[in-house]
Amino acid sequence: MYERRHERGMCDRAVEMTDVGATAAPTGPIARGSVARVGAATALAVACVYTVIYLAARDLPPACFSIFAVFWGALGIATGATHGLLQETTREVRWVRSTQIVAGHRTHPLRVAGMIGTVAAVVIAGSSPLWSRQLFVEGRWLSVGLLSVGVAGFCAQATLLGALAGVDRWTQYGSLMVTDAVIRLAVAAAAVVIGWGLAGYLWAATAGAVAWLLMLMASPTARSAASLLTPGGIATFVRGAAHSITAAGASAILVMGFPVLLKVTSDQLGAKGGAVILAVTLTRAPLLVPLSAMQGNLIAHFVDRRTQRLRALIAPALVVGGIGAVGMLAAGLTGPWLLRVGFGPDYQTGGALLAWLTAAAVAIAMLTLTGAAAVAAALHRAYLLGWVSATVASTLLLLLPMPLETRTVIALLFGPTVGIAIHVAALARRPD
């Protein structure tokens, strides 16, 4: 009797997972249709992000822009950590589709994300007297409030993205990304029109945290994905997510939170710091923003090819390397002119610096790839160790007694190689 009930439960579960994916074409994570959907959404999201940064840089003086950039970076660190929920949810949902389901506890990822987001918001707000004065030199309490609420919202948003990726709902996945970016752009545009100043851009940075609610209200497919359960209890899910969240937080320090890292390791940023931060942001965005947006595709791809860990890395790595090579050439030849024309004479940098910063972006992109492969293989400790080691190495390199531009390039170029080596070594080991 137990075997019959167990088989019936497995069949019911399989039907449930199939129903969620039944409304769209059966395309895989790197099939042409899937990549096209996410790629188009990413292009729109990148355009919105670039426009927000452009509006802030044009509307604010360099010294004030560096204040905005530090908040943007702090939010990036916190919300980047929530990508651990995206990764773990994608992996768990994907595994449910490709492996047999045994009887036992089930977890609702979106509810867990709500609990994690609430705890994170309370911790950020409660601990803010210890660190906010040093980090937020203007608009301190507004920054703390927006950061706390924004993180709670982005926890739920990342989990919904992970569920959509796990069941190949790439149209809704892309729509959620675009909704987030468009909301931010709309608030930034309003800040320009009404002369809101720095506060307006702080609101713009966090406004996208409500996008997941709008998606749930508008899309039955999103509601179906959000209702999915994964094997194991809450403790099992949280243990796996904890490694991913910690590692994603470390990755966010290098990817989104680098202005914060510069602030911590420098006496004063000033106008020069604002120019360097803008250069770092613009040279890495063409690679890292799309790559971050396609984390769901990548993890689903690596899960599907988990018996060929290193071979599955080759094609994405070649694409990243090719784009990076073209980007280095373009940044070196046209970057200084584009900065001068687009952002004004206060933002002047040399072509060599822009080319080297683009090379550094390639290094971080490769680390992002190997990290996604490690998550897909359930190598949580290796994933965590790789990103934390890369972040520590980059931080130490930023302390070198060199000009700001030089140590920035060295830190962003060589720090990630430590993490890449750790990830590749773990992936090279024979699966158990």
Curated annotation (Swiss-Prot):
GO terms for cellular component: plasma membrane. InterPro entries: Poly_Biosynth_Transport. It is found in: Cell membrane. It is a multi-pass membrane protein. The keyword NAD does not apply. One of its GO terms (molecular function) is host cell surface binding. The chain crosses the membrane at residues 35-55, 60-80, 112-132, 144-164, 185-205, 209-229, 242-262, 274-294, 313-333, 359-379, 384-404, 408-428. Keywords: Cell membrane, Membrane, Transmembrane, Transmembrane helix. Its main location: membrane. To M.tuberculosis Rv3630 and M.bovis Mb3654. This is Uncharacterized protein Rv1510.
